[in-house]
Regions:
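A glycine- and small/hydrophobic-rich beta-loop-beta segment
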Residues: 249, 257-328, 332
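Short acidic-hydrophobic, aromatic-tinged amphipathic segments that line or gate anion-handling sites
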Residues: 1-5, 170-175, 294-299
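N-terminal Rossmann-like NAD(P)+-binding subdomain of aldehyde/semialdehyde dehydrogenases
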Residues: 1-113
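Flexible, glycine/charged-enriched surface loops at secondary-structure junctions
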Residues: 96-101, 216, 253-258, 278-287, ...
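Conserved small-residue-rich beta-alpha loop and adjacent elements
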Residues: 98-160
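C-terminal core of ALDH-fold dehydrogenases
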Residues: 308-422
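Conserved NAD(P)+-binding/catalytic subdomain of aldehyde/semialdehyde dehydrogenases
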Residues: 167-254
């Protein structure tokens, strides 16, 4: 498969996300939440999610319930969540931008006032998404949180992860586009936020797309994807389980598998067929693997062109020349180098957030980090001596642009400062 073919796949995937009928349906939900507040959220949640809420307070999750969820976990699972949280914290602190304080020019950072989080819960429970989104915000200095998560099954482990993070207020058992709208615009019960983060289904993604600009969002997530490049020294079953791990996310997930020989690709295909019946989530995997794409690459140039064209959410390089190859990967949500850096470890305990750009958007965006929960501004404090040096240039530029009040604003300060300044 050539680069143009891969480009067409990505283009088709993006087009599928712009369903007009879905957009209109979601816009109606948003409009209703904006105009009716809690009543609309209750109505849509009962209608779509099979709940029987009578009022908005009914879907507020109490701090006691969150604590009870944590207490119910086994010590081993508590320890696993703590290990994951600690690794995320360490990574996020290591990449947190620091203020630059200069004598005349500074650049300073400020945490967002209120951050909102959507934790999916339809086909599976995702306590890992709690940690991968909330912990970066904590490291950034955010202190006010709003969390929405749909309730379709036992959500205790998701609630437990929130308790571990210290997020025990403004947690709501709702999902869907109505949850996004409620966080974006606020209701009588649900506070308005400054930014919404977290993945969801196609309706959640559309809602985030439509409220973007009224609030900030992390990204518009499409179906999850992985690009695997492997040589024939890698055990076939390990590759198959990497593919299954990607496929079991949901039916729309996809894998791009690049190999050096057709015979090795055939071995992988045969083991997929043999192992699929043994998988607990085989129905989802079976649907997902129909989205897979396989290709044989015979030159390094061809490989790198494909890697950077697809700009996949996850890029896994398990190859004898992996150092050289990874050095040339310019566009990817996250790169997993080597046999022991499988994508599944990145989904849980590696450290970087698993909220990553999909659908080729890694060509211009990056995965969620602590820096995404802060704003920044320059602080400009020009002193008299510097003014004398740079004012003439400013005056001439203002005159050239025909902005004469700008020119006068600069020129009028040639006299001494009215207060003590050097």
């Amino acid at each position: 498969m050539d680069v143009a073919s891969f480009r067409a796949i990505i283009k088709a995937q993006k087009a599928a996300g712009l369903d007009v009928e879905r957009m209109l349906a979601v816009q109606n939900i948003i409009n209703d939440v904006r105009s009716q507040g809690d009543a609309a959220v209750v109505d849509y949640t009962n209608r779509f999610d099979g709940q029987n809420y009578t009022n908005a307070e009914a879907f507020r999750v109490s701090p006691d319930r969150l604590k009870a969820s944590w207490d119910e976990l086994s010590p081993e699972l508590q320890a696993s969540l703590k290990t994951t949280k600690a690794r995320i914290e360490a990574y996020e602190r290591s990449i947190l931008y620091q203020d630059m304080i200069g004598e005349e020019i500074s650049y300073v950072y400020h945490p967002l006032e209120v951050a909102g989080f959507y934790i999916p819960g339809g086909k599976a429970l995702y306590p890992s998404t709690v940690l991968m989104t909330v912990v970066p915000a904590l490291v950034a200095g955010v202190t006010n949180f709003v969390v929405t998560t749909p309730v379709f099954a036992d959500t205790s482990i998701t609630f437990a992860a929130l308790y571990l993070c210290g997020v025990t207020d403004n947690v709501f058992a709702i999902g869907g586009a109505q949850a996004i709208a409620a966080m974006a615009y606020g209701t009588e019960t649900i506070p308005q936020v400054d930014k919404i983060c977290g993945p969801g289904n196609a309706f959640v993604a559309m809602a985030k797309r439509l409220v973007n600009g009224d609030v900030a969002i992390d990204a518009i997530a499409g179906p999850s994807e992985i690009l695997l490049y492997v040589d024939d020294s890698i055990p076939v079953d390990a590759i198959v389980y990497d593919i299954f791990a990607q496929a079991e996310h949901d039916q729309a997930a996809r894998t791009f598998l690049l190999c050096e020989s057709q015979s090795f690709a055939d071995k992988i295909a045969a083991r997929i067929e043999a192992l699929l019946p043994t998988q607990k989530r085989r129905d989802i995997i079976q649907a997902s693997i129909t989205n897979n794409h396989y290709s044989i690459v015979d030159t390094r140039e061809h490989l790198i062109a494909i890697l950077n064209e697809i700009a996949a959410e996850h890029v896994s390089i398990q190859h004898r020349d992996q150092d050289e190859i990874v050095a040339q990967v310019q566009y990817a949500g996250a790169v997993f180098k080597g046999y022991y850096a499988m994508e599944a470890i990145g989904d849980y305990v590696a450290g970087p957030s698993h909220v990553l750009p999909t659908g080729g958007t890694a060509r211009f965006s990056h995965g969620l980090t602590s820096n995404d929960f802060r704003t920044a501004n320059a602080v400009i404090n020009i002193q008299h001596a510097t003014y004398d040096q740079i004012a003439p240039a400013g005056e001439l530029l203002a005159e050239a642009e025909g902005l004469y009040a700008h020119q006068a604003s600069i020129a009028i300060r040639k006299a001494e400062s009215p207060y003590d300044e050097k």
